[in-house]
Amino acid sequence: MATSIKDVAREAGVSIATVSRVLNDIDVVNEDTKKKVLDAIKELGYRPNIVARSLKTQRTKTIGILLPDISNQFYPEIVRGAEDVSNIYDYNIILCNSDLDIEKEKEYLRVLKEKMVDGVIYMSSSLRDEILELINELDLKTVLVETRDKDGVLPSVTIDNIKGSYDSTNLLIQKGIKDIAFIGTKKDNMNAWGDRYVGYEKAMNEAGIKIDPELLYLDSIKVKSGYEGIQHFLGLNKKFKGVVCASDDIAMGAINALRDNNMEVPKDVSVVGFNDNFAASIFYPKITTVSQPTYDMGSVAMRMLIKLLNKKELDEPNYVLEHELIERESTI
């Protein structure tokens, strides 16, 4: 016969109401009592009736995670951090991949609402007005990762992308390199990838180096943009000694293009990336990059969301984590 909540209460020596409070993460239960209940649940192998509990509490203990590109190595580690925290608090996850398609994002948000998720972690480099409006319209408790809304209403977890790109550009400048190209996306308000162009621009301006518009290739953050960007510069017969890339994928594409044109990295051209994907550390040459604490971004975002769901005040609604510039073979 299946273990019941009464069995758990009897084993822990508490009331059924106390077991219910522990299951629903209500703060009035002290830590010693909570431990007794959790130990009893583990000992007896008790599995609560999710449907019955959701009908009673109006909560499903389910959180939706919406990410833009599951093939990008940057996002899975964020999901892992979020999932580890969700497991601690007994939340399930529904994972949605939009493939950088805003219409798919909208549809997934509607589906998550229909699934009665308790909240959403929204990952993207930017937050478009129509997505923000839909989140508000659907009344979805949401924490943003890698982006922020312009009014600062939704809680967010990011790094300082401007400072990260500034640091990587400045590394090349300190090595005496002045002809520095940039491959990424256009400057755009509230856009993490666009912020990386702003950081490049700021470092160049502060160093008194004029930016050559023909050494800008503003397309996407994918590998092909890195490859096509280098081919574009070479097609214009441009001379450059450094390339700042808005992602490690771009950097890998750029290095491959340079190699195909018989140019050595870093002997002929130094290349810096952004994100510190695993591939950046094993690519040849190993890529100098701005490392983001991706696991921490996911775990912090999930903790923030669970706090919101429990009607607790956030210590810091817009959390900015530290980045690290890691120098490897592509600039040494």
From Swiss-Prot:
Gene name per UniProt: regA
Function: Involved in the regulation of amylase production.
Organism (species): Clostridium saccharobutylicum
Any Pfam family the entry gives: LacI
One Gene Ontology molecular-function label: DNA-binding transcription factor activity
SUPFAM superfamilies per the UniProt record, alphabetical: lambda repressor-like DNA-binding domains, Periplasmic binding protein-like I
Residues in the DNA-binding region annotation: 5-24
SMART domains: HTH_LACI
Family matches, as PROSITE patterns: HTH_LACI_1, HTH_LACI_2
Assigned keywords, A-Z: DNA-binding, Transcription, Transcription regulation
UniProt key word Lipid metabolism: no
Protein name, per record: HTH-type transcriptional regulator RegA
Domain annotation HTH lacI-type: ranges: 1-57
Domain of life of the native organism: Bacteria
InterPro entries associated with the record: HTH_LacI, LacI/GalR-like_sensor, Lambda_DNA-bd_dom_sf, Peripla_BP_I
